[in-house]
Every structure is written in structure tokens, then in C-alpha cells.
Amino acid sequence: MVDQVNLATEQTSLLYPEVSRKKEELSVNKWTILPALWVGGFLSALDMTIVASLYPVIGSEFKLMNNASYIVTAYLITNTAFQPLYGRLSDIFGRRPTVVFANAAFTLGTFWCGISRSLPELCMARALAGIGGGGLGTMSSIISSDIVSLRERGTWQGITNIVWGIGGSLGGPLGGLIAQRWGWRTAFHFQVPMGILSTILVAWRVRVKPTVRNSNASLLSRIDYLGSFLLVTGITALVVTFNMGGDAFPWVSPVIITLLVSSVLILFAFYWVEKNIAVEPIAPVEILSQPTPLNVCLGNFFNAFCSFVIVYELPLFFETTLLMPSSEAGVRIFPYVISTSVGSLCSGLYMKKTGRYRNLVIAGFFFMLMGIVSFAVLTSFGHRTPLILISLCLAMTGCSYGMNLTSTLIAIISSLAPEEQAVATGLSYLFRATGSVIGISLSQTTTLSILMKQLASNLKDDPDKDDLIRRLRESISIIPNLPKDIQKLVIKSYATAFTWTFALVAIIAFAGFWCSLRIKQFYLHTSVDRS
């Protein structure tokens, strides 16, 4: 039997030398192409956590602390809106020009951030960086799918996620250190050389052709202009709605209602255009009409929603309820970051060995659900919450998130034809990014709303209640210095708010688990040529 296999391999090499040569080239190229892409991915993850640690400092310098969150929002809007465009654009213009554009836009935007003279200008610079940042992760996945077999794809994705995890872990401490010694502008400028290096590497190394057939039509005429405009506009309106709702404006205000209705109508118009007008749609309706791609995209939305709630809510819980300093609160999240990378890599190795992903998907979403429920229970203990149990739950949910990142990507790729992979990858990243933005916004709004009610109830006998609530909204640093009896009531109010927030997020986690049950198992090919 072994001789027959060897003979068949030899015959293939002799009769079809171009096929053998192509496989050898791909085997060599992936060791040079993928590390070149990882530089951009590392930089993107590093940048996001750097900015998360710097925006309060930047807002204070411009004396616009109440608007400092728009530094983050501007990046998230363009990052989310442009992610699905990269799939189709890379099919039209090619992989290399598209990934070079993404790196160049990110680098130019980051440089602009360092020389911005006002907060509005800085927000515009962050928006430009977001356009590029949206393509760094998406194009890395698309190109990986072009040159790596489905059986090995999970392993390489796991390594990619480790690189992103390292970048994300270093960003906060590194950004804070640089800003403290040399100023926040240096924190942006020191990224520029790495951005230039990443741009040069992908321009030099990435030589990958799209899997779709070339068209005789003009490249520019193939772009879905109307669909692109509607998608970017609709996503922008949606993200702005969930960022401003409950903060800048009440949820029932005319501004928020108008934005929400407008985003729904625009996205419905986008759906109609993609289904009836677009010749080469950026989001083919046929893909989302299939059970596995649809449930993968929805699952990515719910999974990212839960993940970002954990990352943003638990540090606040540590600071307000357990009275930890911000530096220690950030370190307490490390089990989540580390286990995310471990879960992603281990799931990739498992899929490479067994060729199966469905059980990983189900297990990942199940443990995410159990973790969210556990957080709802543990936060109810307030200042008596056992830290060891919190750390174990962080490790469990981080591992499950990493498993889901890798296994769902393989699930959607394996369920579609090669020419649909790039667009489908962009769609999955769109749902993931949208889930993260909405998760952050809704969880923070929910926590704040419940907290205000709890404070008003628990402090009803305090004559200075209104002034204390106002001060707590401005800064949580006053909690450790409050009188013990008042401090106990404030901590109790925060604990109740976090408990209810995680209880409501558990519904989202269950929706993700339900989607995972509807994802089917497809064959994972062992070669790049899936024919």
C-alpha cells in the first residue's frame, strides 16, 4: 500500500511537474509570507492596547476628558466598517496590493496621530489608522487560507493568535511607560518604524494570487461602490449609536432613536443591493443563506461580545469592588490573554491531527457560557470574591475564546468553495468586530444604569447622596478614601451592578452556544488544492 502511494506521488510529479512545483513553492513561501503578515498583526494588537491606556492622558492634555473616548471610537468605526471590504477588494486587485495598502494606511494614520494638534484632528488620524487596521487581521487570514491546507490552517491560526496576544499584552504597559517618560506622542511615533518594516516585508514577500478567476472588465468597474457606501454608512451609524447611547444621549432621545432607525434602514438597503444589484457583491447573500456560514458569523458576534465584556468589565470590578490599583487590575487579566493563545494553538493542533472541528466549536461556546455564568455568581460576593476562582474562570473563558477563534474560522472556510473564502473571512471578521463594539457599549451602559439605581437606593439616608454619586461618576479613585460604612454600601452597589451585567450577558453566551450546535462538520483537505 505504501509503495502504491509512493508510486502515485512519483507519477504525479512526473506527469504534472507544474503541480508538484506549485506545492513545493507554497511549502517554502508560507514560512516567509506568514511571518511578514504577523508583524502587522502584532503592531495592530499592540496599538489597540496602547491607545486604551493612553486616551485618558490625551484627553486631559487637550482638556477634553469627557470626549476622550472618541479617540477609541473613531478607530473602531472605520476598523469595523472596512473589514468586510478587504475580502472582495483583494479578489479584484490582488492580495499584495491590498495588504500593502492596509499596512501603509495604518502606518500613515499612526504617524499622523503623533503630530496631531487637536482632539478632532487626532480622531481623524485614528480613523485613517482604523481603515488600515481593519485589513491587517482580515488579510492575514485570507492569505493564510490561500497558502495553507485546511488541515493545517488551525495550527497556523493558533500561532497567529499567539502573536496577537503578545502584542496585546505588551501594549498597555509599554504605552504607559513610554508616555510617562517621553510623552504620549512618542507612543505613536515609535510604532511608525515597525509599520514601515511591515509594509516593506509584505510588499517584498507576499506573492499570492486570488483563488477567483480574473475578469476582463476594468478593475475599478468591478468594485461594488453602492454596496460599499451603504455598508460603511450603516455600520458607522450603528457603532455611533451604541457608543453614544446611554452616555452622550439617553437611549430614548431623538438623536439615538434616529441613528438606530437610520442604521437599520441603511443596512436593509445594503442587503437589497447585494442581493439584486451588485455584480460582484462584497457580502454575497448566498453565503449567509447557508446554515454553517450564518451560524459561524452569528457565533463570532456573540463570542466577541462576551469576550470584550470580560476584558473591559472585570478590571473595573477589581478596582471598584476589590479596591485594587489599576496596575494590578490589568495584571489580573493575564490568565485570560495567555489562555486565549494556548486555546487557539491547541485547537489548531487538534484539528490538524483529527480533521475535526465541530466538537471544538461546541465545547468552546459551552465553556464560554459556563464562564459568564460563573462571573455572575462570583461578582455577587463583592469584596469577598475569591480571586483564585476568578483567575480559573478567566483561564477557562480565555481558552474557550481562543478555541472559538480558530475553529469557527476553519468551519466557515471548509463549508465554502475556494473562491468564496476571502469574502466569507471578511464577513466573519465584520461580525466579530461589531460584536466587540456593541458588547463594550451595552455592558458599560447596563452597569452604569444599574449602579445609579443601586447607589440611589443604598445611599438614600445619606444627606450628601447626590454629591457622592456625582463624584463617583467622575472618578472611582475616591472609593478607597470613603468612610467605611459608606464604602461598604458603594462596593455593594457596584457588585450588584456587575452581577446583573454578567447575568444579562449570559443570555448572549447562550445564543452563541445555540449557534454552535447548528454548525456542521465538513472535510478538511490536507493540501492547498482542494479539488
UniProtKB/Swiss-Prot annotation:
Disulfide bonds: none
Main localization, broad class: membrane
InterPro entries: MFS, MFS_dom, MFS_trans_sf
Keywords: Membrane, Stress response, Transmembrane, Transmembrane helix, Transport, Vacuole
Cytoplasmic side: 1-30, 247-252, 319-360, 407-496
Pfam families, per the entry: MFS_1
Record topology, Lumenal segments: 52-225, 274-297, 382-385, 518-531
Coiled-coil boundaries: none
Record keyword Transport present: yes
Up-regulation conditions: By nitrogen starvation.
Membrane-spanning intervals of the chain: 31-51, 226-246, 253-273, 298-318, 361-381, 386-406, 497-517
The keyword Membrane belongs to this UniProt entry's keyword annotation: yes
Any Gene Ontology CC annotation: fungal-type vacuole
Membrane topology note: Multi-pass membrane protein
GO biological process assignments: asparagine transmembrane import into vacuole; basic amino acid transport; isoleucine transmembrane transport; L-lysine import into vacuole involved in cellular response to nitrogen starvation; transmembrane transport
Compartment list: Vacuole membrane
Gene Ontology molecular function: basic amino acid transmembrane transporter activity; L-asparagine transmembrane transporter activity; L-isoleucine transmembrane transporter activity; L-lysine transmembrane transporter activity
Family: Belongs to the major facilitator superfamily.
Function: Efflux transporter. Confers resistance to a variety of toxic compounds.
PANTHER family per UniProt: MAJOR FACILITATOR SUPERFAMILY (PTHR23501), VACUOLAR BASIC AMINO ACID TRANSPORTER 4 (PTHR23501:SF191)
Designated name of the protein: Multidrug resistance protein fnx1
